[in-house]
Amino acid sequence: MSDNYSLIIKNGSCYIDGKFQNVDLALSRNKIKKIGKIELNSNKVFDATGKTILPGVIDTQVHFREPGANNAENLESGSRAAVAGGVTSVFEMPNTNPPTSTFEEFNKKLEAAQNRMFCNYAFYFGATPNNMKELAAVDTLKAVSYTHLTLPTKA
């Protein structure tokens, strides 16, 4: 008895063991379950002949401009655009208005992201000359890291 898959990607070029190989991928519940030659057993089959299959891309420097310039882009629209381009994870920069350089602003951003992001996400904490105490404790936050802010800031 063969497995049922939600999607089979046929004849795609994947980089495996140091070289590109044409393989099939079987997915179930958005996870790769099998790589190799796969007999068709899915309602959805995508022919990837001549195409390269890549894992999701991680963008470590996005600027979604929320808060402050939500009319340009925000967490929801930016993450939707990322996913449309094959990006599965983003690290958002802290140069917003106000900047994400205090625990209060960082926690507001985490709260704003709940149920609005369409990909995996993390936020940088902004380092300024005026927030050294916060920087010393930044590892207690859910920040991916911290980065310096090169714009005028109060915090």
Question: What is each model feature region?
Answer:
Residues 1-41:
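N-terminal metal-binding scaffold of metallo-dependent hydrolase/deaminase domains
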Residues 39-53:
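Active-site metal-binding motif and surrounding structural segment of the metallo-beta-lactamase
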Residues 51-116:
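Metal-associated gating/positioning segment near the N- to mid-region
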Residues 58-60, 121-125:
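Hydrophobic faces of well-ordered beta-strands that scaffold small-molecule active sites
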Residues 72-79, 131-140:
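Short, acidic/polar
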Residues 82, 109, 138-144:
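Generic structural signal for hydrophobic
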Residues 88-89, 144-146:
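Short acidic/polar active-site loop segments enriched in Thr and Asp
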Residues 147-152:
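Conserved small/polar residues in nucleotide/adenosyl-binding loops
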